Amino acid sequence: MSKSFNDMEWERYTNGLIQHNSQNLEQMKQLLGNTGCGFCLAKFRQVTLHLGTGMTHSCHHPTPHKIPLDELEKNPAALFNTKHLKRARSEMLNGDRPSECDYCWRVEDEGGLSDRIFKSLEPWASDYHDEITELTGDENIFPSYLEVSFGNACNMKCTYCGPEFSSQWVEELKAHGPVRMLEGTDVETSFHDNVDLEKLNYTKREHNPYIEAFWKWFPKALPHLKHYRITGGEPLMSKDTFKSIEWLIENPNRDLEFSINTNMSVPDKLWDKFIDAIQRLEKSKSVKRITIYSSVEGWGERAEYARTGLDFELLRKRVEQIAQMDNIRVNIMAAFNIFSVTSFDKLLEWVYELKQKYNPNSNLVRFYKKTGFQANLNKDFVAYSDKNPSHEIIVGLDIPYLRHPEYLDVHFCTHDLLENYLFPTLAYMSERVVNSEWNTPSGFEGIEFDKLKRIVMHRAHYNKKNHNDRETHTDITRGRGQFYDFVNEMDRRRGTNFVDTFPEMAEFYEICREANETIKGK
């Protein structure tokens, strides 16, 4: 097979984007394999910067590593070109598998298609395949997909988060100390026991050399960017978020897709300031597209348990507010975890309703405008299409797999939870996947379904029902034992009650208690 991406035939949508279908995925897998078994375009084109802590990783799966200040002082481009990253790139180009990318290797070793393949098919990656294969790995390069957190200022303390990304977590750990699990055993673990909370993040009052370097580097990086995404903390609590918006208004990149994560639970005054800024950016036509991401992984009080500080009804209201605005997309981002299992179906029902209500069927709109025939088309969809010219889809869904902290990983759930909740949830979603030219995008996209499917299938293969010894395997027993201690400590600190909030998981809670007592020898 040719090593050239541009010489190959790819099945594309009508808008020119490459489809994430089985044929294209297999073709990309083979194309990457021509360079090496661990070759991944995301390592060369995607970066997430945690400027509050001075950490970076490429892509989002590997554990973040520190950006050495001595490297940064010599060259601000070290934000994306640390010696660590250059070494990993060289390994990929020389046919090796970097150890930090173990998530993808696990999926592939189980016979699946990992994010390495899916990400490499994205236009911000695939368009650069041919030039990347000519590199040695030691070059200073620019990303095409930049995600940045300016600090940990946040008004929430999600259960799966921590002090690196939440100032509320910092305050809780200062007040109560680290969360200890399986205490007194040889597998005792502590959540952020050895972290210097005073030095973990640069405060607003301190000079932050990483943010200083960012604003030196960003003007040079901007022309190379296809995606710029701001995350947190809570981005709306950072002045650099609003500085970014103003910078983009004054320095257009009309090939750029700009997006911001927000918990949508900030005070009204701050929310209104954000809405004003984002509407001015849209009216300036300085960027190609704008997307607002909001995180929620379950429904109602279960979602609020997982994300302490979340106002679920306010989030629902503000999601619809964004969906009704001109030419701005809203995407629900659900970091799938153990707390998602029993109410994710209700979340999907809501997202499906939003898609039905707000997503214009661009294919039928074009057909209507050309022929005058209204083929199964609501007239409101024509209006939505006209006021959203930059977006084929107004309401989207992303389902990343939460791997850390490990004791909140869904792979520790029981067979009953898998069979009674996850399989039916997957079936619900599969029945509403729309992949035809006729109905797109009134249902779930294939790529949205695939993300949930990979998570559920990973759980099924991790702990197979016909392998009885797996249910009592050391790793599973330890993870469940840790989970028991974790939720009990969260309940004590936050005045919550896991079993009252998740009565359908009471049996799982007891299984975790038994695992905990087994390890502790009770």
Q: What is each model feature region?
A:
Residues 39-42, 97-109, 153-164:
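Local cysteine-cluster metal-coordination motifs and their immediate loop/turn environment
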Residues 143-153, 164-209, 222-239, 251-274, ...:
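Core AdoMet radical
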Residues 1-58, 62-71, 119-121, 170, ...:
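Radical SAM enzyme [4Fe-4S]-AdoMet core and its adjacent flexible, acidic
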Residues 45-56, 135-164, 226-230:
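N-terminal pre-triad scaffold of radical SAM enzymes
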Residues 22-29, 80-94, 142-149:
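Short, intrinsically disordered, charge-biased short linear motifs at domain edges
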Residues 33, 61-108:
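Membrane-interface junctions of multi-pass transporters
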Residues 50-55, 61, 106-119, 140, ...:
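Preference for well-ordered, secondary-structure-rich cores of eukaryotic proteins
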Residues 111-145, 154-156, 177:
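Recognition helices and adjacent regulatory flanks at domain boundaries
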